[in-house]
C-alpha cells in the first residue's frame, strides 16, 4: 500500500473542471493523495435575475482545500503558468473549454478526461441528458485520452450504471457523481501505471450529445408518449421541457405514460384531477403531475385544482 500511495504523491496533477460532478473527481484525486498542484475552472459568471456572481463548485473546493486555481477565458492564456508547474498529467472532467495541442503536450503523460458516457456513444457536452432523453437503459463513465478531436481519444476503462424508468437527469447525475468518484479513486492510478491498454473507439458506433438548445427543450405532442415522457425526464430538474398554454410558456415535470388513448388532437388536455393532467399525444396519453407556468412557481397539479388556473379540460397545448 505504501508504494502505491507514494506513486500517487509523486505525480503532479493539474485538474480541470467546473461544475458539481467535477468536484467528485477532484475529491477522489485528493483522497488518493495525488499531488494536485493547480485547478483550472471556467471564469465566474453572473447568474439569475440579480446577476449575482456565484463561484463554481470546483472553485469553491479549490479554495476550501487551499489549491492554486486559474480561471482563464481561454486556457491558452495560462500556457506558461502550466509549463512552470511541470505536471505529470492533466485530468479533466466537465471543464467546458477546448484544449489545444500546445497545452495537451505540456504534461509528461498527457491529458486524461473523465467522460460521462460509454464511448463511443454520446460524445459531447450533454451525455447525461441525452441518455435519458433517448430512453437508454444504461450509461456510465470512462477514462479516456484527450486528443484534438472532441471525445475521440482511446478509452482505458469504464464503469456502468443502470438508468431506471423513474430516473430523471437530476437523479442520474447523482449516480454519475458517485461513479466519477469511484473510477478516479480505483482506476486512474492503474491508467498511469499502464495496467489498462488504451482501446481505440469504434468510429462506426459514434453518436453525439451536443449541448441542449432551446429547440430541444420544446415538447412536440405529435411524438409518442414514451418519447415525450423521456424528454421531460431528461430535462428535469433543469432546464425543463416546455410547451405553451394560451401563449404562456409552461414547463412540465414528473410525467408518466398511461394506457389510455383519446381521439383528441395531440396536446389536448383530456382530464385534470389530483393525480395530474392527462394530455393527448401521438398514441397514449401522458399524465403530468407538476407544472410551472411562466411567471409562477413550480407546483403540483393537485394544488391548482381549486384556483382560477388557465389549465382547463379541452385546452390544447402547443
Swiss-Prot record:
The taxonomy runs: Bacteria, Bacillati, Mycoplasmatota, Mycoplasmoidales, Mycoplasmoidaceae
What's this protein's family per the entry? Answer: Belongs to the Fmt family.
Q: Which PROSITE patterns match?
A: GART
Would you tell me the protein name for this molecule?
Methionyl-tRNA formyltransferase
Q: Which Gene3D superfamilies match?
A: 3.40.50.12230
* E.C. no: 2.1.2.9
Q: Name one GO molecular function term.
A: methionyl-tRNA formyltransferase activity
Write down the top EC class of this protein. Answer: transferase
Binding residues annotated for (6S)-5,6,7,8-tetrahydrofolate, in chain numbering: 117-120
List the catalytic activities from the record: L-methionyl-tRNA(fMet) + (6R)-10-formyltetrahydrofolate = N-formyl-L-methionyl-tRNA(fMet) + (6S)-5,6,7,8-tetrahydrofolate + H(+)
**Cellular-component GO terms for this entry:** cytosol
Sorted alphabetically, which keywords does the UniProt record give? Protein biosynthesis, Transferase
Known InterPro entries for this protein?
Fmt, Formyl_trans_C, Formyl_transf_N, Formyl_transf_N_sf, Formyl_transferase-like_C_sf, GART_AS, Met-tRNA-FMT_C, Met-tRNA-FMT_N
Q: Entry's SUPFAM superfamilies?
A: FMT C-terminal domain-like, Formyltransferase
Record HAMAP family: Formyl_trans
Function of this protein? Attaches a formyl group to the free amino group of methionyl-tRNA(fMet). The formyl group appears to play a dual role in the initiator identity of N-formylmethionyl-tRNA by promoting its recognition by IF2 and preventing the misappropriation of this tRNA by the elongation apparatus.
